[in-house]
Each structure stands twice: as C-alpha cells, then as structure tokens.
Amino acid sequence: MKLTADHESKAGAGMKLQMNAITFTADKAEKLKEVKPANPNGYYNYYEEQEGYTYFVVTGKAENEGSMALDTDNILVRGTRGNIEYKGKLLFSNTEESDLVNKMEKDAEQTFYFILLVKDGQEPPDTIEVFYNDDFRKSQKAEHYDYSIRWPVDSLDLE
C-alpha cells in the first residue's frame, strides 16, 4: 500500500523514538510465536500463533508527557526491509501489565509493543514506520497522514 505523509522524518538509529510528546525507549527486539502481556491474568488480549508466521516484537517503555491520549487504532504501523512490507500494530500494557490495550493516556508511562508479522524464513524488518495525524486523530484519508517517522531497529539486539 502506498502511504504518504505531509511531514516525513527519520528517528536516529538507536533506542529512542519521539512521536509528539510521547517518547518510546526500546529495551529489546525478539521473535515470538505468540504475544502476551507480561503478567496475564483472567481474560486478556493476546496475539495467538499463526501457522507459517512469527511475530517480530520491539518492546520497551513509553512515556506520554503530552496533553493527549493516543489511541493506536488511529495510527498505522508497518515494518520494512528493502521492498518488503510487514503488517504491524502498536499496543501497550495496562498498568498491571495483565492485558494488551490500544490506548495510552496522557501523563502515563507504560510498556509498549510494536508487533510485526513476519513469514517464517523471512528476515525481520530493519525499520519501523509510524504514520499519524495531529492530535492523534483518525485519518480522513486511508492512505494519507500528517506525519511519518522511520525508526531503524536493526541496531537492536535480536533475542
């Protein structure tokens, strides 16, 4: 899918990504067959195993020092390696780290999960792209956003 943005930027190689007033600091990258919260309890959201695929997951801490919450349903995440695109999603842990949620409130610090689906045998993405709009509002045009950030993640150690 051809995506466009009015303003494009590239995060520096390394562990941090800045998106509006939210700072993402990566701790690790890993390949997983399923993605669960750190302390699952009762009913919880998770990504179950998909035959023929592995999840490439970048996790760490996100800190929202802004005045707006982020609903990840309003942004688009994908991974890339050369001409290959990987479908992606951004989720957060709730405060108890017992569930995966799609919202980060203002003045919050939460664990984040950039989750990208990779075919078995395929190299994982070396870049994560995030497309979003002012105030994190929903895009009016399916393939156009106000901002895009390219975040090189190939320097993260794959566990």
Locate predicted features:
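Conserved functional micro-motifs across diverse proteins
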Residues: 1-57, 61-159
